Structure formats: structure tokens, C-alpha cells
Amino acid sequence: MMTEAERASIAADGTDGLLGKRGKGVFHIHTLGCQMNVHDSERIAGVLEANGYVPATEDQINDNDLDLLVLNTCAVRENAAERMYGTIGRFNRVKLVRPNLQIAVGGCMAQLDRKKIADTAPWVSAVFGTKNIEDLPKLLDQNRATGKAQVQVTEQLRQFPSQLPAARASRISSWVAISVGCNNTCTFCIVPTTRGKEKDRRPGDILDEIRQCVADGAKEVTLLGQNVNSFGYGIGDRYAFSKLLRACGTIDGLERVRFTSPHPAAFTDDVIAAMAETPNIMHQLHFPLQSGSDRILRAMRRSYRSAKFLDILGRIRAAMPDAQISTDIIVGFPGETEEDFQQTMDVVRQARFSSAFTFIYSPRPGTPAAAMEQIPRDVVQDRFDRLVALQEQITEENLATFEGRDVEVMITGKLGKKDTDTHRVTGREKTGVLVHIGVPEGEPVPEIGDFVTATVTHAGRHNLLADPDVAAGQTYSVRH
């Protein structure tokens, strides 16, 4: 794995450095799906770099000047499979121009559909799963030697992906997986099939990784798991997750900690207290509802009901009045009636989520819900549109409450030309809301990773604007 210093040296050396020599090949990873896939893509990149491959520059990506394309796939929704095959088809068009290009497909769809991928797309060089990322370099070598597609997908996890080298996409924000897999049996979900049963990492290993991230320059980490708050249940410690959160609060230099995704059934008061009492745990929570109908929740095998869900939200907000809580909602689950849908709308009105990821139900082969009677598409679309309209209204009303308030924003991402021309920087405030900040005239532009405290002057539909008038007493300050 290359260090930041080595990357900088390569960039400075140009054609005389490793990029000029191309190593074993120049690669690019295209990632579909969730945050866990983003985490895994960083591990795929780390494994490739450790084996002599070189990450592509932006110009090389734009020019298709590549020796290896890796697709890390998602299997959560039906259109994810369609996107995968569409992307593989686009990769083939690149291969027609660059015959020596290798194409590798990994992730959840590879775990699920390995043979079909190889049969449908004979131009694919290697297929690997979620549990054997470390095998990719060997599969690529075998493909080069034999000219035949290499398919290797294992069912048992040999080691946590987090134990593999990582080439992190961000210098200041890091993903840290605390577990893999899921022990729940939701009737709509394919994740237990593709990721397996839940396995937890040792708390000491997790904390060591976080400390290393901070030593490497990270100011923020996001703890990842399919059900983070059931962490430790397998060894009989139901307080393990809240202990982990509190331990994060003892790490010097770690400014912000987030986590995703918890399961409402296991969201207990000790976790709420840890969030409220640990200064660097952000008051941001993604809390999947899925449906507000108890009948549908039962059919989904979600082990909570709407009253319990709302009760937990009430306890969270009592402890953290500033908490921003987002959710997932599925519309059109098999058997959903208009009455069921209205119950979901009622819960959304009461919960007042900061935002919602709303999905039209899509059957996943092999899940119990796929065999149930489906609802006509036009009915589902109408319900979906009504739910989105309601949530958009709530989101706008919520963002409007930020106007006139001072927020601390961590500057993230690259500054584009538009931002430079308008003298703006972008980042997220503590509860995760996106904020665009106008830098006052005469002030230097903050660097990525700086913290800017500024007065919010306008609330948009999905973000905030801070154009502070310092002369009028509004706030603008920078902390490095």
C-alpha cells in the first residue's frame, strides 16, 4: 500500500515514477451500493497497490488509459443488478479499444450470481466475492497466464476485510467496519445471503485501526456494520457497542464519530446515553423504519412495531434535542394496502425525519417476499410520489430551523471550479447536514479538513447556505 508521501512523490516524478512505469497495471474501481461497498473498495485498492498495481489518475480514467477495471457490485435492489450488467457492457466497449484490459467483478452480485456473470459476459477476466477480496491479484495473474475467466467465490469468511491493506479515498474521513454480515431474517433482504452471518471484530482491533486512521490524518470516522448496535451480542455483551462509542471518545485527535446502520430492535438506552455523553459522537442517526404499518412490519419480519419505533425516537430526542434522524422506507411491499400506506405516512408525520431514503419495493430472487403477491406498479408509484412529497416538505421545514444559527462545518471533498469562482467551500456540520459557505472577502480559503464556524443565512431544499456578514455581527471563524 502506498503512503500519502509516496503518492505525492509519484505525482511529482511524472513518467519517471511508478505511474509512468504503470507497475503491474493501472487500475480503476467503480463502486455500486452502500457504505460497506465503499469500505471494501478501499480494501480492494489496498490489495492491488500492495501487489504492484497503480491507481489511475483522473486523466487516465477520462481517457480510458487503463489496464484493469474493477466493478464492486450491489445486490440490494433489482435495479442494482441491471446497473451491474449495464456497467459490465460499458466496460466491454473499453476492452474493444484496449484488448489487454482486464475486467474484474466483485461484491454482493458476484457473491450471488457468479456463474451467470461469467456466462453472460465472457470478456470478464475475474469474478470474486465479498469474502475473498485478497484473492483478486492471484485471479488476475491466472487470467493473464491462461486467457480464461477466473471465478472464485468463497462462502466462509477467512479474514475480515478490515485486516487487508487499505487505500483510503479520503485523507480526513475514514470508514471503519466493526462487523460483517447480518443475523436478521427480513423477508425482503438479500444481505444475509451475500454477506453471511454476523461476525464482530475485536474491540481492541477496531480501536487500533481508528487510532491509525487518526495518525494518518483522519479527523472523522464512520463505524460500519449491517446492524452496528448488535455488536457484541454474539459473545453475550449487550453493552459492547455503547462501550465502543465511549472508547472512541478517549482517542486524541478524533474530532467526529458517526455510525451506520443501527436496527431499531436493538437500539437501547445505553447507546443513547453514550451518544449524548461522548463529545465526539455526532448527533446524527440513520434509523430504518421500512414501514409504519405493524402488519407489514410483521410480514417483513422486522422485530419492532411502530409504537416502539416512535418511543425510541422520543428517547433519542429527549437526550439529544439537536439530533438529525434519517430513515429508510419501502413502498409497495407485497400485500401493502392503502390503509397500511397511510399508517406509514402517519409515522413519518410524527417522526419528522431529517431525510428519508424511499424505495419502491423490488423483489430479490431467493427472498421470501419475492414469492408473495406483488402490487400493481402504478399503485406503488402513486404512493411513492405522495410519500416523497410529504418528506420533502418536512425536510425543508427542518432545514429552515437552522437559519440564523451558527454551525461548525468540517470542510470536505475537492473544491471545484464553480466553488473557486464563487469563493465557496463545502462541508458538513456536526449532524451531517451539507453546508455551502461563502468565504468573506479578504479571508483565505479554508483547506480540506479545516473546521469553519459560520452563521447560516439561507436554508435550501436539501442543504444550507452560510454567507455571513461579519460586519453585521454574523460569525465566521476557522479552526485548523
From Swiss-Prot:
Q: Does the keyword Magnesium apply?
A: no
Q: Would you tell me the Gene Ontology cellular component terms?
A: cytosol
Q: Name one GO molecular function term.
A: N6-isopentenyladenosine methylthiotransferase activity
Instruction: Name all TRAM domain ranges.
Output: 400-470
> Which transformation does this protein catalyse, written as a reaction?
N(6)-dimethylallyladenosine(37) in tRNA + (sulfur carrier)-SH + AH2 + 2 S-adenosyl-L-methionine = 2-methylsulfanyl-N(6)-dimethylallyladenosine(37) in tRNA + (sulfur carrier)-H + 5'-deoxyadenosine + L-methionine + A + S-adenosyl-L-homocysteine + 2 H(+)
> Where would you find this protein in the cell?
Cytoplasm
Q: In terms of one coarse class, where is the protein primarily found?
A: cytoplasm
Q: Name one Pfam family in it.
A: UPF0004
- UniProt cofactor(s): [4Fe-4S] cluster
Q: Where is the MTTase N-terminal domain?
A: 25-145
PANTHER family recorded: CDK5 REGULATORY SUBUNIT-ASSOCIATED PROTEIN 1, MITOCHONDRIAL TRNA METHYLTHIOTRANSFERASE CDK5RAP1
Which family is this sequence assigned to? Belongs to the methylthiotransferase family. MiaB subfamily.
Q: What is this protein called?
A: tRNA-2-methylthio-N(6)-dimethylallyladenosine synthase
Organism whose genome encodes this protein: Bifidobacterium longum (strain NCC 2705)
The gene for this chain is miaB
